[in-house]
Amino acid sequence: PIIDQGPLPTLTDGDKKAINKIWPKIYKEYEQYSLNILLRFLKCFPQAQASFPKFSTKKSNLEQDPEVKHQAVVIFNKVNEIINSMDNQEEIIKSLKDLSQKHKTVFKVDSIWFKELSSIFVSTIDGGAEFEKLFSIICILLRSAY
């Protein structure tokens, strides 16, 4: 399971190898995956849409909303950036702590959504325990400013 508090899990070399083996196949189809993940998240947690004021108010047309597509790609690309930085933990920590501060003060996002979105992300890409560890790291760091 994905955790969002406590000490940061450690990605082993085996975890990193498994992620690096699977991720390029997923990232190659990032537009499809990213939109599916965000739409599934908003369907499961409609109240989370309040965190995205630029999205159209018509929930039935979210898949057509260019802002939804843009945000989906932004999220997916951030995950890609983290995966590409797995060997530089300091860089990941700084990047996600800065993003945490921004989500708290600028975007005013409830920190509960990080874990919920991460769970949907991992299940959508059919990720294993190594992805749960990776997203636990992401969630813990995204909650750091809260």
UniProtKB/Swiss-Prot annotation:
Source superkingdom: Eukaryota
Keyword Metal-binding: yes
InterPro entries per UniProt: Globin, Globin-like_sf, Globin/Proto, Globin_lamprey/hagfish, Mb-like_M
Domain Globin: 10-146
SUPFAM superfamilies the record matches: Globin-like
A molecular function GO annotation: iron ion binding
Keyword field: Heme, Iron, Metal-binding, Oxygen transport, Transport
Family of this protein: Belongs to the globin family.
Protein name per UniProt: Globin-F1
Source lineage: Eukaryota, Metazoa, Chordata, Craniata, Vertebrata
